[in-house]
Amino acid sequence: MTIIRVKENEPFEVAMRRFKRTIEKNGLLTELRAREFYEKPTAERKRKKAAAVKRHYKRIRSQMLPKKLY
C-alpha cells in the first residue's frame, strides 16, 4: 500500500504527482492491468515466451555491427 504524506501548504496537484510517481515506481498500475482479467496459464506462458524472444532479438540487433554505408 502506497502512502503519501501531504506536507503543509503543499498544493493538491503536487501531492497527486508524487503519488502517481511512487505508484509507477512500485509497478502497481502494471500489476493491476495484468490482473484485471483472468489469463489462462497457457496464454500467460505464450505471452512471456514471445516477450523473451523479442528481448533476445533486440539484444542481438543492438550488438550487431552497423552495415557500411557507401
Swiss-Prot record:
InterPro entries found in the cross-reference section: Ribosomal_bS21, Ribosomal_bS21_sf
GO terms of biological process kind: translation
MF terms in GO: structural constituent of ribosome
GO CC terms: ribonucleoprotein complex; ribosome
Highest taxon in the source lineage: Bacteria
A Pfam family of this chain: Ribosomal_S21
Keywords: Ribonucleoprotein, Ribosomal protein
Family the entry assigns: Belongs to the bacterial ribosomal protein bS21 family.
HAMAP family according to UniProt: Ribosomal_bS21
Name of the protein: Small ribosomal subunit protein bS21B
Organism: Burkholderia mallei (strain ATCC 23344)
